[in-house]
Amino acid sequence: MKSNSSTAVHSNAFNFGEFVSGGVDPRTGMYTCALSLGKLHSADLNGPDVTFSLSFNPLNQADVGFGVGWSLTMTRYDLRSKIMTLSNGERYKAVETSTGLKFKEMKLQTAKVLVTGPGRYEVRYKDGRRELLKVMAAAQIAVVEKIVAANGVSITLKHDVFNQFPVLTEINDAKECLLRIARKAGQVTLTRHPDTASSSDYKLILKNSLVTAIELPVGKGWDLEYEVIDGARYLHRVVNPLRAVEIIRYKQQGHHFVNGVERTLPFVIAHDVYPGRGQSRLCKTYTYSDRNFLGHGLIPAKDDDGDPLYRAPGTYVYTSDEQLVVGGKLHTLIKRTYNKFHLLVAQVTTCGDAQTTVATEYHCSVAKPFNEQPAQFRMPKVHTVTYLDRRTHQQRKETTVTEFDGEGNLLKYVEPNGVTTVSEFYPATGGDNCPEVPLGFARFQKKSTVTAAAAGGPSTVTYYDYVLHPALAGAELASVLPIEERDFELVQGVEVLRSKTERSYLDTPDDPLKHGATREQSVTRNDKTIRTAFSYELEGTRLRVISSTRGFDDALQTSEKVLSTRTGLPLAEVGVDGERIEYEYDAIGRALRKTIAAGTIYAASTQWAYLAASKQQMATMVTTDSSGGEQRVAYDGLGRVVTVQEKDTDHPDKEGLIPTRTLYSAMHDAAGQKVRSTLTDWRDGKPCPVVTLYEFDDWGQISKTLHADGRIEHTVADPVLRQQTTWLEGLGKTVTLVNEFGKPLSVERFSLKDKSLGKTVYTYDGSGRTTSQTDPVGNTTRYEYDAFDRLVRTVLPDASEMVTAYADHSDEAVPVSIAVDGRVLGEQTYDGLNRLTASIVGGRKSEAGYEAGYTQPKWFKGAGGIKYLYLSYCFKMHFC
């Protein structure tokens, strides 16, 4: 039987995250590779962002400009095959109409495609983004020539033809080139921000049209090797920048197609990962059922234009098994079951006596044909996690219920603890407080109601209002922006307003930098309003955002943040007290330096250096603090910390002759668990290691800790009973029961003879807040809270009541009075910026005053009447 890979394989199994994001896809058995190379920001951070990602698909055996099988994740439409590939990697067969493209297999309209002219298409997304496509006649493929953000700001894309395929060459915004792609023999170079000080190169090294290495601007990159199966290339060996090695093995005569099709599709049967640096290999093997995502066992339809499984009977399912092998024996088995719509309906994970089953019911009915399924048929409806102890046969279930509408909006969410969130959305045509949505998607939330579980607790309602913001000059469509949120608490069925948030935006249609940016945000509680105004200043490639917060009493506080317009990373921050912090980064966004009080006599810097992994050394991050102390953290190929070393700062070594000393090291087993850690102290230049060993139970949790001093710590965590038992060998036990919120219901201590030494019991409301605590002798303390989860009332065992009141302008824990049994013991006063201005305790009053908007007091007046002035504090550190 012939084995073959083909781009003609059509299955919606490829439109799921495991396939699109890379790795071994348990649905299909394919090993794909997706390498994220960062995000491109545009238009001074006010334009569309482009995810910069390269992906390998073994089913694509063409070289479209990046090497065989490799491509950038960009939207395109092939007029010959009628296949539309979206920017998220999903692929759909299209039906062409006079007005646009329709996709029979895209029930939930995450994207709409319009025909805007001869050879031109427009892809509209739910988030308001648009992509304008133009057909390149030489290739008969439509590619993106412009991406327009919801606010109207756009970027343009340029393409050329390579090997009869359109290939991206440049991405530009209105100011500069964001990305340039150049090709020469044996190499493809992707340059971010070319011809600028921020320029950085990513290189694909090719040999015989195969990508054999991907080089990063700094440090190591990826090394790639392939296996050829019937003329098709499959990744066989992948080495990542940390030098972990992946080995992928395939079964050549793999998945069978529908009956009568004489070919097979290879699948992965083993995936080994070698982290290196003395860490254990991770070994996984895979097996698959005869029935598969290709529809083996089905009679092929005359019209094979769609997914064959969509025409399968409702009983058609296929499975895959993933086995984690440790020491040549099965350690963990994961069995996955998929229905005819490629939806994961069951996942059973078994390790020894521990078994966890995740079952998912969807908004679909497998008994009905595809054309009768609702738009949200792929969305989960009931998600049930079952914990089973196979030794005792006891089990416990946790259920999550979700409900989606035909637009994919989440209408109802019931958590396992019983807390329920119900949402309403405005229709695409809008409503009283929402304009018509320009792109025709119903995506704006109208109302959200959160109801506590059966035990009671606060229920809240939030309303959302929106406005149509004018279009940017030259843009076709206006944008919809949120302008108001009103938060209510339900008190005996009556909505009581607790806070209101209002937003306004800059209306500068001729200025893309500021148009649509937030101008002011105000929060009102109890008729007291706190306003924050924002201003924006562009200084080359530095965007300064100034936030000015004015309290209800007119107190003003200002802070600043400077962002790189090319990376979006913070370059500097100025806090409300004038403290300044500056940051520096390398070409791939890693921190290089952090300087506090830069440019002053108080300047102090922390620096980072990154040593690339090699045969001689591990990938290492070197941190040097302001006093010259140096720490080296080394990582294995999976990014796990394996050693920490430091220099002896007590005995400075200016010549750098004294080697660093190892303070910490770790070892991991073949299941990926940390089984050994060593902490090393140094005395008179000699190491004094302290070794701790760990053992794990079948649930993957630490069950035994062997300390260096001989102590043996036991932990039995039982997810079935929601019980945790801990003890030191030779001592009594502590048993803790937890509730649905993961909080303790009771903590009971036992003697060596299993005699109870006392039990503390807790109760909770339906929001998971503690309502009472009863100690081992029966004393009960009760608690009450306000709508912002602040403790307002405590009733002690002797019936004494402690009542705490908070500032009515804030939702933070800012207490203004504490009273016991009706008698006020203390009072405090805060200004509109939550700064303490006065305090009365036992009739004695103290006061504080502040300069401008600083948080530190300028003066303090004690109860004795003496006034203290603080003159030594440097308020404006960046000017000192």
Regions found by a protein language model. Name each.
Residues 35, 52, 92-880:
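Extended charged/polar low-complexity repeat regions
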Residues 1-129, 215-217, 240, 252-253, ...:
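Intrinsically disordered, low-complexity segments enriched in small residues
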